[in-house]
């Protein structure tokens, strides 16, 4: 998830299921206003975050998904932007021209493939939640694009260096020990034919590809 630097707004929140047996990583992004019930306490995802921080947000997402996620990570806006810049930006494809300006958000992008820095990418994530932006599923698609770019042999060769520059600054329960345990899995993902899919509902996170939508 990513929150504003003031921690009063959720920019995006998503659950990820890496199903390597089926060769697919599925991502479900949620609108921050989505209601979640934690042991009878009903509130929006943003409300749960304001009440109990990252751990409460994780519980809220777990309740929506119907399973308990192994790990969580939450960044502030500046941490997200810095992470993308450390990784030399992100390559995105913009389907049509975007010219959007309000007091809260200003974004201008031309159509086509382009490499953007962290600030522009975060604005794009935020734009997705505007009426014309495509919604949370579009945010999920952007996350899939990022995963497919960054989980590769080039980045993994310097994985520990990137970990120390990025993960160590986040609000997360992912440790360097966890990263070490996952290095083989990440290498297998980088070497294999992994499909990254943005799904529209939490229930689809655990449904095998052949049965999805039935």
Tell where the protein language model's regions lie, with residue ranges:
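Short beta-strand scaffold segments in enzyme catalytic cores
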Residues: 1, 12-17
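C-terminal solvent-exposed extensions
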Residues: 3, 7, 22, 26, ...
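Solvent-exposed coil/turn segments that connect beta secondary-structure elements
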Residues: 5-6, 18-22, 32-35, 77-80, ...
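Extracytoplasmic
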Residues: 8-13, 22-30, 56, 67, ...
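Extracytoplasmic/secreted envelope proteins and their assembly/folding machinery
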Residues: 12, 54-62, 77-81, 85, ...
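Second-shell loop/turn segments in exported
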Residues: 43-51, 64-71, 126-134, 147-152, ...
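Amphipathic, coiled-coil-like alpha-helical scaffolding segments used for oligomerization/assembly
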Residues: 50-110, 173, 177
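Flexible, polar/acidic helix-loop-strand segments at domain edges
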Residues: 85-162, 170
């Amino acid at each position: 998830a990513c929150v504003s630097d003031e921690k009063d707004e959720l920019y995006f929140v998503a659950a990820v299921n890496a199903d390597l047996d089926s060769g697919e990583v599925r991502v479900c992004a949620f609108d921050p206003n989505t209601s979640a019930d934690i042991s009878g306490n009903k509130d929006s995802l943003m409300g749960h975050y304001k009440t109990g921080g990252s751990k409460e947000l994780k519980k809220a997402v777990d309740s929506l998904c119907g399973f308990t996620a192994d790990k969580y990570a939450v960044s502030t806006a500046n941490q997200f932007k810095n992470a993308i810049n450390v990784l030399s930006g992100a390559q995105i494809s913009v389907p049509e021209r975007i010219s959007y300006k309000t007091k809260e958000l200003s974004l201008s992008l031309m159509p086509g493939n382009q490499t953007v820095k962290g600030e522009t990418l975060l604005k794009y994530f935020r734009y997705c939640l505007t009426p014309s932006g495509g919604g949370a599923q579009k945010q999920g698609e952007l996350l899939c694009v990022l995963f497919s770019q960054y989980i590769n042999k080039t980045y993994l060769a310097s994985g520990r260096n990137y970990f120390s520059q990025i993960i160590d600054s986040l609000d997360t329960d992912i440790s360097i020990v966890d990263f070490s345990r996952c290095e083989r899995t990440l290498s297998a993902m980088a070497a294999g034919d992994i499909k990254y899919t943005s799904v529209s509902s939490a229930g689809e996170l655990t449904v095998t590809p052949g049965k999805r939508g039935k």
